[in-house]
Amino acid sequence: MDLNTLISQYGYAALVIGSLAEGETVTLLGGVAAHQGLLKFPLVVLSVALGGMIGDQVLYLCGRRFGGKLLRRFSKHQDKIERAQKLIQRHPYLFVIGTRFMYGFRVIGPTLIGASQLPPKIFLPLNILGAFAWALIFTTIGYAGGQVIAPWLHNLDQHLKHWVWLILVVVLVVGVRWWLKRRGKKKPDHQA
């Protein structure tokens, strides 16, 4: 079974799972796969939006349920948390939709929104809207980028095994060096 067959068979499920938390890379790759004809563009957008929406909904509910307890654990970031909570109070609609576009806020954003006690009837439709906007934008970028890397992708199957072997050799060399270094540090302790 080649890589293209795997992508065609399991691509949509991988997109849903991959976009549950961060997901920009997965979404871009979904767009590339759509450009290559391995996946259908509308289904890529739908899969990515679904994964992003589910992930953010779970984080929102965790924030709503455990928000105070969770946020107290990040005492050194209290000023940033308070600033974000003020933004949520002033511009809840923009914050809910925009949090998925803010670097570093994709996971903590929905949790903060839940902790702010924004009602679910407001969060859910905004979450759906934001998820579809985010999915459409990043899938489109991936689709456009697919043209740039298309020539390289056609030879990916031929070169994939070489990359896998290279990675395995690097991991093996690093592992052996670490083991020898650790073994060398233990030796003097046994002689003393």
Swiss-Prot record:
Keywords: Cell inner membrane, Cell membrane, Membrane, Transmembrane, Transmembrane helix. The chain crosses the membrane at residues 41-61, 122-142, 160-180. Pfam families: VTT_dom. Residues 62-121, 181-192 are cytoplasmic. Residues 1-40, 143-159 are periplasmic. The keyword Transmembrane applies. It is a multi-pass membrane protein. It comes from the Bacteria. GO terms for cellular component: plasma membrane. InterPro entries: DedA_domain (IPR051311), VTT_dom (IPR032816). One of its GO terms (biological process) is FtsZ-dependent cytokinesis. It is found in: Cell inner membrane. Belongs to the DedA family. This is Inner membrane protein YohD. The lineage of its organism: Bacteria, Pseudomonadati, Pseudomonadota, Gammaproteobacteria, Enterobacterales. The gene is yohD.
